[in-house]
Amino acid sequence: VGLTDIDMSAIDKVRRKLQRTLGRALEHRFLDRYRDLRRSGDYEPSAAQTAQRSLRHAILDYLANNGEPAHVDLCVQHISMADNLTDALVGLGILSRIDCDDRQAMMQAFYERWCSDPLVLLKWFFVVGASPVPGAIDGVRHVMSQPYFDLMNPAHGMNLLGGFFRRNYIEFHNPDGSGYEFLADVLLEIDQFRPDAGSWLMPQIMQWRRHEPRRRELMRAQLQRIASTDGISSGLYELVGNALAESEAA
């Protein structure tokens, strides 16, 4: 039971339009409140400061996504002037969802600032994977090719690949099917050395029957491609086989 014939592009279009509409209609109020919430004292992990930061971040998200270059600049400034990791990471996450020239520069600057911290690097991996901008797959593949990324490290895979396959609802469901093909490529690669690790990358594609016909067929084709590959593990074969069998019984 649930939604069927889901069109992720249509959902995203409506969501973005609503966000832009609110961001523009409430622009001046948002800007005033954003400035009012600027912290004057030292950073504290208190409930009061946490609530203020959360509201400030939500306002910044609406402003940065309303289409005004000045507000993208505000997001860049937010990251650059951050005196704590929370502000910097949230700002980077907001900017990562905007297709603009500053995005890649700030992503690289953040990496260079924090690359020596393994835990922060994991968070950066997630931001890269979840970024819903055109070319997201190329960005993930680029990180996978770098010496600082280790596919054998579960935490690396969980954050970078999990960010894309589990949380990037836009580019994973790109209407050209590239996200589904990428998933099949990665599953087949991982299956060679960690046969039990692929299932956590698959929650979106396991819901393939609920999507609109074009995406449904593209996802099914990649599931069939995996199932027909010689030498895959019994676990992956069973997982994919069950998904395909359920569709035939439905």
Language model regions located:
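Long, ordered, helix-rich scaffold segments
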Residues: 1-250
